[in-house]
């Protein structure tokens, strides 16, 4: 199975399954000298961790990360960083009834057809449990980006089902279980989720992620454009079915006179492009959005088939998130951080000595 690594200069490779012994990752390319401990990663892992609220899966995993290599006396050495998280709360018996049954909307059928066998326990490698290691690796990237380049990354839920944020208050994001920036909608979100859980159904969500302080010049046209790599990374998150950069699909109804980001010596007057022009960062905030589908692991009966080709009914048991978007915020942050880290190192390798006489623009 290929496709377990991302990046060229900052390379993250993950391994492990939902109900396996452990999850792990190897980070190659992290510069030496970065102060790093498990605590630097644990905060984001706790934000993603299951069982932290009544709106997420009841599976309780401490997700305590261990550094196995690449750090000496509290600093990165420039060699491969090995990270490990043990699985401690598997209940594989919950999945014994679907050993030969395909859950509609999941990867069961496609994994079976591609590999000729599959780990049916919680989806195995296709489970979002794997994203814990992406968050750990992303936390390393986030620390380097912030400490060395002053880049900050913040994600939030901008929409859950029919409920959208109408105001954006970053101080509210970490104060509620939804990572929602509009405090006036929290009661409606709570009521909506309570009714959803009663019905045994699930719902989709939209997650937004913003990176500020990104310098001009990141991105490698034409095939490694910054927005292309961001889209690639975000689409690699479980359940993501759509990615937008800047105004995204909203540009369909825009006129050229409306959507262009006008410039002056004082800076850009807008940011419809989401901080990327021609595949290269413009110095403005990078803005991306992802759409996550509702999980198909629900207690509402549905039609499917067995591995032997017989008709069957599926009622999913086990512990699942009624809205996977709630825990996707730190995952989206991590994937954006990994891409920015990779492109910073690539830019440094080729363009470190480039000096432009054009003034650097900011936001007015």
UniProtKB/Swiss-Prot annotation:
Q: Which PROSITE patterns match?
A: CHORISMATE_SYNTHASE_1, CHORISMATE_SYNTHASE_2, CHORISMATE_SYNTHASE_3
**For binding NADP(+), which residues are annotated in this chain's numbering?**
48, 54
Its pathway is: Metabolic intermediate biosynthesis; chorismate biosynthesis; chorismate from D-erythrose 4-phosphate and phosphoenolpyruvate: step 7/7
Under catalytic activity, the entry for this protein gives:
5-O-(1-carboxyvinyl)-3-phosphoshikimate = chorismate + phosphate
Q: Name one GO biological process term.
A: chorismate biosynthetic process
Q: Which UniProt keywords apply?
A: Amino-acid biosynthesis, Aromatic amino acid biosynthesis, FAD, Flavoprotein, FMN, Lyase, NADP
Amino acids binding FMN:
125-127, 238-239, 278, 293-297, 319
Record flagged with keyword rRNA processing: no
What EC number(s) does its UniProt record assign?
A: 4.2.3.5
Describe how the cofactor binds: Reduced FMN (FMNH(2)).
Q: Where is this region: Disordered?
A: 41-60
Q: Which cofactor does it need?
A: FMNH2
Assembly and partners are described as: Homotetramer.
Tell me its family: Belongs to the chorismate synthase family.
Q: Its function? A: This reaction introduces a second double bond into the aromatic ring system.
Q: What is this protein called?
A: Chorismate synthase
Q: What is the lineage of its organism?
A: Bacteria, Pseudomonadati, Pseudomonadota, Gammaproteobacteria, Alteromonadales
State the gene name recorded for this protein: aroC
């Amino acid at each position: 199975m290929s496709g377990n690594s991302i990046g060229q200069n900052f390379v993250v490779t993950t391994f492990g399954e939902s109900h396996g012994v452990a999850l792990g990752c190897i980070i190659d390319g992290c510069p030496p000298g970065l102060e790093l401990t498990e605590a630097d990663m644990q905060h984001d892992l706790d934000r993603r961790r299951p069982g932290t609220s009544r709106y997420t899966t009841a599976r309780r995993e401490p997700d305590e990360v261990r550094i196995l290599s690449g750090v000496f006396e509290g600093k990165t050495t420039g060699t491969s960083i090995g990270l490990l998280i043990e699985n401690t709360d598997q209940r594989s018996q919950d999945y014994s009834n679907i050993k030969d049954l395909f859950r509609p909307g999941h990867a069961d059928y496609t994994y079976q057809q591609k590999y000729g066998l599959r780990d049916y326990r919680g989806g195995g490698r296709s489970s979002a449990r794997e994203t814990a290691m992406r968050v750990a690796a992303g936390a390393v990237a986030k620390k380097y980006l912030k400490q060395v380049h002053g880049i900050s990354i913040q994600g939030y839920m901008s929409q859950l089902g029919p409920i959208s944020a109408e105001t954006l208050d970053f101080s509210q994001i970490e104060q509620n279980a939804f990572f929602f920036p509009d405090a006036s909608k929290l009661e409606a979100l709570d009521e909506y989720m309570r009714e959803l859980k009663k019905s045994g159904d699930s719902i989709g969500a939209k997650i937004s992620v913003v990176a500020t302080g990104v310098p001009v010049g990141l991105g490698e046209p034409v095939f490694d454009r910054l927005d292309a790599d961001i889209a690639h990374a975000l689409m690699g998150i479980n359940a993501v079915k759509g990615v937008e950069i800047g105004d995204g699909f909203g540009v369909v109804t825009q006129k050229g006179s409306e959507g262009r980001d006008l410039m002056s010596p004082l800076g850009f007057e807008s940011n419809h492009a989401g901080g990327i022009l021609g595949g290269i960062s413009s110095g403005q905030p990078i803005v991306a959005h992802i759409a996550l589908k509702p999980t198909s692991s629900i207690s509402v009966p549905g039609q499917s088939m067995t591995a032997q080709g017989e008709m069957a009914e599926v009622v999913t048991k086990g512990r699942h998130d009624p809205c996977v978007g709630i825990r996707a915020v730190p995952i989206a942050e991590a994937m954006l951080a990994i891409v920015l880290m990779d492109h910073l190192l690539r830019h440094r390798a080729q363009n470190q000595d480039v000096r432009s006489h054009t003034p650097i623009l900011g936001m007015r």
